[in-house]
């Protein structure tokens, strides 16, 4: 049995998101680079009210996943597969060796600025739970919205103008769906951000990239990324294309992953996977008091499943 590492997307930032790595020497280069990029101390940035703004959130999320990895890489077995949810896919590439941490952070900032520039005003994302994909697509078609992320059989993130999302929410709730607003202010992974795709592809082409050294699954099609060209395509195309997260998790399982560890803030990805794959062991780093506790759990989980 083998290990999958997951890097989260936006929404779970919180003031204590760097507490487990605050005094970790191995994480210091990542934290210092993030502070320099943001123009303020990374710990202060995590507590600030603007931590959900794209230009703050995306570097913070990459930094959190990479800092956790720096503290765990010497004590964990080599992952069988790595995947990232939205901006988490960029962090996943840094873990897989496609880019270094500094390049990852710089690209995250460029990504955020390009998404903001391409985004229409008064738009964003919300979660729709309790209806299947066909019903969700019908709701989107009826109200001018789009499926941004397919997280599970009846769990979707939809994007669009807020007016469209409010109308969709009322319609969906009348059919028994649950709606959860998200603190994301751009309609990521929808055609509304098509204007950001080519500029971000150009930024990726100009960066120092290489093929991943570890197996990594792309969010848009759940296929392994094996070369530089595919990396550029999948990371740029996802800005305006649906993330097929449920398919990514299915492929991770099919590739032998039975222990899943979410890096970074929160445990949203772990909570998605656990009920869908009850035969697997699934946790998030932030469910433990320390990185040592998370590493000990990984080793014990792998032993239990042998």
PLM segments and residue spans:
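Helix-rich "cap/lid" substructures immediately adjacent to catalytic or cofactor-binding pockets
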Residues: 1-83, 158
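Alpha/beta catalytic cores of group-transfer enzymes, especially the acyltransferase/condensing modules
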Residues: 10-11, 95-239
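Gly/Ala-rich beta-loop-alpha elbow adjacent to hydrolase catalytic centers
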Residues: 65, 80, 84-88, 92, ...
């Amino acid at each position: 049995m083998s290990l999958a590492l997951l890097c989260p997307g936006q929404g779970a930032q919180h003031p204590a998101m760097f507490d487990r790595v605050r005094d970790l020497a191995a994480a210091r280069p990542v934290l210092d680079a993030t502070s320099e990029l943001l123009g303020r101390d990374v710990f202060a940035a995590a507590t600030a009210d603007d931590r959900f703004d794209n230009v703050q959130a995306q570097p913070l999320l990459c930094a959190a996943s990479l800092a956790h990895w720096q503290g765990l890489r010497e004590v964990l077995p080599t992952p069988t597969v790595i995947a990232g949810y939205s901006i988490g896919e960029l962090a996943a590439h840094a873990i897989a060796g496609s880019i270094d941490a500094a390049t990852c952070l710089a690209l995250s900032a460029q990504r955020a600025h390009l998404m903001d520039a391409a985004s229409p005003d008064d738009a964003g994302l919300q979660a729709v739970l309790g209806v299947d994909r066909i019903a969700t697509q019908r709701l989107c078609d009826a109200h001018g919205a789009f499926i941004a992320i397919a997280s599970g059989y009846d769990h979707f993130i939809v994007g669009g103008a807020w007016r469209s999302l409010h109308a969709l929410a009322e319609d969906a709730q009348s059919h028994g769906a649950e709606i959860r607003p998200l603190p994301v202010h751009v309609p990521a992974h929808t055609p509304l951000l098509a204007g950001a795709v080519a500029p971000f592809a150009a930024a990726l082409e100009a960066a120092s990239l290489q093929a991943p050294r570890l197996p990594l699954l792309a969010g848009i099609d759940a296929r392994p990324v094996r070369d530089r060209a595919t990396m550029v395509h999948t990371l740029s195309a996802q800005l305006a294309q649906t993330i097929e997260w449920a398919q990514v998790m299915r492929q991770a399982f099919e590739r032998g992953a039975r222990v899943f560890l979410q890096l970074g803030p929160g445990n949203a990805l772990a909570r998605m996977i656990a009920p869908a794959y009850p035969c697997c062991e699934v946790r998030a780093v932030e469910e433990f008091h320390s990185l040592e506790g998370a590493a000990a759990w990984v080793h014990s989980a792998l032993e239990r499943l042998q």
